[in-house]
Design a protein with these regions (language model features):
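C-terminal segment of classical bacterial N-terminal signal peptides
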Residues: 17-27
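Flexible loop/hinge segments at secondary-structure junctions
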Residues: 26-442
Length: 442
């Protein structure tokens, strides 16, 4: 079968493409109305952007090429057609995804689901409740990925003359963002990098997200556990208004990681420390190219962006030590898998008010310390503002993404599969979806 003739894929800035399906490869999802027409769109976290984009294409290819999974391709059309099903995701950041979820366009074709890497705060849950969105909802983990600490230091060499890899730990990363560590040759950084010959006497250009970000949530979740000074000195709390509050906000038992832009919540502290302001960029896709183009810059991105832009990635100290010595790890499939196996997670998709715990700073000498889930929010009931076929199409895609889509064949470089038990619980939530009160996938 000629895929190019059967389905013509068009990916726009909003990651839009046409899908032609009557089921997924495993045959478990509902059959889609052959006359189904319309969009299936969501918004939110940029952490999973590369994976969602890749899934869209793979899903289309899988169902076009696998015998028996498509009854008749004649019923499906391209994304620029007036008929057919069109799947899209516009990004915008986790905060945008959450606010859109209970916004004016909720439960319509342009807002059928949202992505977030951050838990719903009590304020956000109260806003959803006050809005009365007209239905219950679920929050499921869609994909897992590590955060990479990325940097550019031109000409960094080992004492033997080879290209050097920077080592960092929670305290040094915290110090860099606080502004207590201003230069690359600071004694704290040098102590972690005895084999690096030429750490420069250059000011560190600290970069962070300018938008409300779930990636920042994962980052601050890590610092809250990994940096001994983070609880009271890193100031990562959404409600502080002064440097005093920032320095004294939370103890270890009540630490609350946030999505707030680093340039905002570190501003007073950095000024007090005589450090320059943090450079803010929107989205993982805004930070990665900036770091690539800027010598002496440092930031944090989902690891797929580090790969995509060929960025230098720091080796970060694991929680566990080997024979009393720190172990430094980079984000790989193996180190992420070790972290997920060791991490304790608290997940209850039937109760979205549950604080989902990001699997950061897991024990084990092989556990990469900055790993996070990216969650997907969807409504339990979709009204007549969308068609049954659109809801069927969304369920079919999500079921595929949580099953076949988690295999190495379909994972974009820099992402990892979620644990099987987690995916099984997520798929169970799809069976709760109704259209006008009627269960879509019994």
């Amino acid at each position: 079968m000629n895929l190019a003739k059967s389905i013509r894929v068009s990916i726009t800035a909003a990651l839009v493409l046409a899908i032609g399906i009557s089921g997924v490869a495993n045959g478990a999802a509902p059959t889609i109305d052959p006359n189904a027409v319309g969009k299936i769109e969501g918004s939110g976290a940029t952490f999973p952007w590369n994976q969602y984009k890749d899934w869209f294409t793979s899903f289309t290819d899988e169902n076009a090429d696998t015998a028996g999974t498509v009854a008749s391709l004649a019923q499906f059309h391209t994304s620029n057609s007036t008929s057919g099903l069109v799947l899209g995701y516009s990004g915008g950041g986790s905060s945008t995804g959450i606010s859109n979820f209970f916004g004016a366009n909720r439960r319509t074709a342009t807002q059928m689901f949202s992505g977030t890497d951050a838990v719903l705060t009590s304020t956000q849950r109260a806003s959803i409740a006050a809005t009365d969105i007209g239905t219950k909802y679920s929050v499921i983990p869609a994909i897992t990925g590590p955060l990479a600490i990325v940097y550019r230091i031109d000409g960094l060499k080992t004492t033997g003359g080879a290209k050097a890899t920077l080592r960092l730990d929670g305290n040094t990363i915290c110090g860099i963002y606080l502004g207590t560590i201003k230069k690359w040759n600071d004694t704290a950084i040098k102590a972690l990098n005895p084999s690096v010959a030429n750490l420069p006497n250059a000011t560190i250009n600290v970069v962070g997200r300018s938008d409300g970000s779930g990636t920042t949530f994962v980052f601050t979740s890590y610092l809250g556990k990994a940096a001994t000074t983070a609880q009271k000195n890193c100031g990562m709390h959404s409600n502080f208004t002064s440097s005093t509050e920032a320095n004294l906000n939370d103890d270890a038992g009540t630490f609350t990681p946030v999505t707030t832009a680093p340039g905002t919540y570190f501003s007073a502290i950095r000024t007090a420390n005589g450090a320059a302001a943090i450079t803010g960029k929107s989205g993982n896709g805004g930070i990665a190219p900036y770091v690539k183009a800027t010598n002496n810059a440092i930031s944090y991105v989902e690891a797929s962006y580090a790969s995509k832009y060929s960025l230098s990635t720091a080796a970060v100290a694991a929680q566990s030590k080997r024979n009393g010595a720190k172990v430094y790890l980079q984000p790989t499939t193996a180190t992420v898998a070790a972290a997920l196996k060791a991490a304790a997670t608290v997940e209850d998709p039937t109760n979205p008010s549950t604080a989902f715990v990001q699997p950061v700073y897991a024990t084990g000498v092989n556990s990469y310390p900055i790993v996070g889930y990216s969650w997907l929010m969807f409504y339990h009931d979709y009204p007549s503002t969308v068609t049954l076929g659109q809801v069927q199409g969304m369920i079919a895609f999500l079921n595929w993404a949580l099953t076949d889509g988690q295999s190495s064949m379909y994972l974009y470089k820099g992402y990892s599969p979620t644990p099987q038990s987690t995916r099984a619980a997520a798929i169970a939530e799809l069976h709760k979806i109704t259209h006008n009160g009627v269960v879509v996938w019994p």
